[in-house]
């Protein structure tokens, strides 16, 4: 697990590097599907002092199997998503400014241009709010459940992120670094959408044919973006 702990540590350290977190906010995890174990950031440990060996290993029930610290308080959310979507290899949660603003506004981040379409096939959805019962109960688990309720059976890697109403963004990917990459892009397109709608409140969504072209040339069966 040492290699995966190193990867998760490096991915967590990318969050302050890209300006996605303040203080100890945010967390990244990754899963070893063969072993049924998840590596995740410890709760409340400062990025400035954090080391790879500080990463916490939990099983799919959330029991700590390796590590000196308590795992992230959002661990149950991560585990619920891993259980539901086998294609996920890494998950990240932040409170990045612009994506969180859309979450607080209770609005999906609209697909307005090709930057968005290169990564997200359609709007980045916003969940419903959690009920008082859901918050007072197993809050973090129910956060995962409301994300799943919103995504349904859609392939999560086609829209690798979501904003949780009144909370903030979650993103995911094939591994921890891919999840952080998508979180960075989500923050950027959230900012772009806010600026674009401020300039033109009547702005329409990107044309579907243009969105399809940009997404499929990077992610479709006949993708040709980049090098083989």
From Swiss-Prot:
One of its GO terms (cellular component) is cytosol. SUPFAM superfamilies: AraD/HMP-PK domain-like. Substrate binds at residues 26-27, 43-44, 72-73. Pathway: Cofactor degradation; L-ascorbate degradation; D-xylulose 5-phosphate from L-ascorbate: step 4/4. Pfam families: Aldolase_II. Its cofactor is Zn(2+). Coiled coil: none annotated. GO terms for molecular function: aldehyde-lyase activity; L-ribulose-phosphate 4-epimerase activity; zinc ion binding. The active site is at residues 118, 225. One of its GO terms (biological process) is L-ascorbic acid catabolic process. It catalyses: L-ribulose 5-phosphate = D-xylulose 5-phosphate. Binds 1 zinc ion per subunit. The keyword Manganese does not apply. Belongs to the aldolase class II family. AraD/FucA subfamily. This is L-ribulose-5-phosphate 4-epimerase UlaF.
């Amino acid at each position: 697990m040492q290699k995966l702990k190193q990867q998760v540590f490096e991915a967590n350290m990318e969050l302050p590097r890209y300006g996605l977190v303040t203080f100890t906010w945010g967390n990244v995890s990754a899963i070893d599907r063969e072993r049924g174990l998840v590596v995740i950031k410890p709760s409340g440990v400062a990025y400035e002092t954090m080391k790879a060996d500080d990463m916490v290993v939990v099983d799919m029930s959330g029991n700590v199997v390796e590590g000196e610290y308590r795992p992230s308080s959002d661990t149950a959310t991560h585990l619920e998503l891993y259980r539901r979507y086998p294609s996920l290899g890494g998950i990240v949660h932040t409170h990045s400014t612009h994506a969180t603003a859309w979450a607080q506004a209770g609005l999906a981040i609209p697909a307005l241009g090709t930057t968005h379409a290169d990564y997200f096939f359609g709007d980045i959805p916003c969940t419903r709010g959690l009920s008082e019962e859901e918050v007072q109960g197993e809050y973090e688990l129910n956060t995962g459940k409301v994300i799943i309720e919103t995504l349904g059976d859609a392939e999560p890697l086609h829209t690798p992120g979501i904003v949780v109403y009144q909370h903030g963004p979650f993103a995911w990917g094939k591994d921890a670094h891919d999840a952080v990459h998508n979180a960075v892009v989500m923050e950027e397109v959230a900012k772009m959408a806010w600026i674009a709608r401020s300039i033109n409140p009547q702005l329409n969504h990107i044309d579907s044919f243009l969105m399809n072209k940009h997404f499929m040339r990077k992610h479709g069966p006949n993708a040709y973006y980049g090098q083989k």
